[in-house]
């Protein structure tokens, strides 16, 4: 799936983007590839960090990466629209059913580059358990499907650790670090 940021967010040459951006870059095409579960857990940690932020801010999380496709070898040109539809449905309704899938299983269903769906799992991990899909499209123009989903939170479930506890733990872990001679941790 492609994410043309310039279509979704205003940009001008003088002031830059109309919002603050924090890209999280994930390498998913060379081994060792982190597991689907690990990407999902990273998303859960990202949610914890966002909820612990001291200001009340609006946050949008974009998960990018191709659905089924393969661009090399004898499998070049492979697509699996049925798997793409199943993945998108499970991502919305039951993301944890995807977490024990191996990289090999993801590649078998979606082509080697189709394992990029783990980045969608990172985004989903950052959302509450209950979401509503308010927009979904899927188009297969050639080598790689183009798909979008907008998932909106429908519950306020909080992580196991309260946001204030996360902040207190971070402050405790780094207390005094600024006083270490010859180091610049902040």
Spans of features found by a protein language model:
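Non-transmembrane, aqueous-exposed alpha-helical and coiled segments at domain scale
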Residues: 44-59
């Amino acid at each position: 799936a492609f994410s043309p940021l310039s279509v979704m967010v205003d940009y001008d040459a003088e002031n830059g983007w109309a919002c603050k951006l924090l890209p999280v870059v994930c390498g998913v095409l060379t081994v060792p590839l982190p597991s689907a579960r690990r990407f999902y857990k990273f998303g859960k940690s990202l949610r914890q960090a966002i909820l612990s932020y001291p200001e009340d801010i609006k946050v949008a999380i974009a998960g990018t990466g191709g659905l089924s496709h393969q661009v090399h070898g004898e499998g070049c040109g492979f697509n699996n629209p049925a798997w793409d539809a199943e993945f998108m449905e499970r991502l919305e309704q039951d993301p944890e059913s995807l977490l024990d899938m191996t990289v090999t299983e993801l590649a078998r269903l979606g082509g080697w580059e189709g394992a990029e769906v783990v980045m969608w799992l990172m985004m989903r991990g950052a959302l509450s358990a209950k979401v509503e899909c308010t927009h979904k499209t899927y188009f297969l123009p050639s080598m790689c499907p183009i798909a979008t989903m907008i998932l909106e939170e429908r519950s306020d479930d909080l992580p196991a650790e309260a946001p204030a506890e996360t902040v207190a733990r971070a402050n405790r872990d780094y207390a005094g670090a600024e006083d270490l001679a010859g180091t610049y941790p902040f």
